[in-house]
């Protein structure tokens, strides 16, 4: 014969230990209050951070930054081809970045390390794409346009009998 069911099952609640943590409170009964507190605290921290930054900026005053002039035409009257990274000057015109300026005037360049093999270089070879300094062993010349490329920017085409190094500009047009 089966056991008879408890006549008080619907009336008596289950007596289980329930652990209520911060997570249950923030998702359940107190969800609205906790989310409002978090929102207010976040907003207050953002405004305090922005105010501290602005106070720091205004305390320094307005400093005038002297940037190099835009490139002037050479003696032939035609500007040099703009290859590699260019920057927008304060007047809105494009200016050469430091790597291209040092390529044009190598007299003020200090001895630095090669970006590929970390050997000391004299600063004359600079990648035409990313403007990293290169030593003599790491210089790769593009088969298409003849520009200098580093090991990261130079793509090696092994489809022919001989390997061809292509810069990223020329690699777009090769099929």
Swiss-Prot record:
The modification Phosphotyrosine is found at residue 34. Keywords: Apoptosis, Cytoplasm, Host-virus interaction, Metal-binding, Nucleus, Pharmaceutical, Phosphoprotein, Zinc. Residues 36-55 are annotated as: Interaction with BCL2L1 isoform Bcl-x(L) and inhibition of BCL2L1 anti-apoptotic activity. Residues 105-123 are annotated as: Interaction with coxsackievirus B3 VP2. It comes from the Eukaryota. Its main location: cytoplasm. Phosphorylated by ABL2/ARG in response to oxidative stress. Induces CD27-mediated apoptosis. Inhibits BCL2L1 isoform Bcl-x(L) anti-apoptotic activity. Inhibits activation of NF-kappa-B and promotes T-cell receptor-mediated apoptosis. Binds through its N-terminal region to the C-terminus of CD27 and to PXMP2/PMP22. Binds to the C-terminus of TNFRSF18/GITR. Isoform 1 binds to BCL2L1/BCLX isoform Bcl-x(L) but not to BAX. This is Apoptosis regulatory protein Siva.
């Amino acid at each position: 014969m089966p056991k008879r069911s408890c006549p008080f099952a619907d009336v008596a609640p289950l007596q289980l230990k329930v652990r209520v943590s911060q997570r249950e409170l923030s998702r359940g009964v107190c969800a609205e209050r906790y989310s409002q507190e978090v929102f207010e605290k976040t907003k207050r921290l953002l405004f305090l951070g922005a105010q501290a930054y602005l106070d720091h900026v205004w305390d320094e005053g307005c400093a005038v930054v002297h940037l190099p002039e835009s490139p002037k035409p050479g003696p032939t009257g035609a500007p040099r081809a703009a290859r590699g990274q260019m920057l927008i000057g304060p007047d809105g015109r494009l200016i050469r970045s430091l790597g291209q300026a040092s390529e044009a005037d190598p007299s003020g360049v200090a001895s630095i390390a090669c970006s590929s093999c970390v050997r000391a270089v004299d600063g004359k070879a600079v990648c035409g794409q990313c403007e990293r300094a290169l030593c003599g062993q790491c210089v790769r010349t593009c088969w298409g346009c003849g520009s200098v490329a580093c090991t990261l920017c130079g793509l090696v085409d092994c489809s022919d009998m001989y390997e061809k190094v292509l810069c990223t500009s020329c690699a777009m047009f090769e099929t």
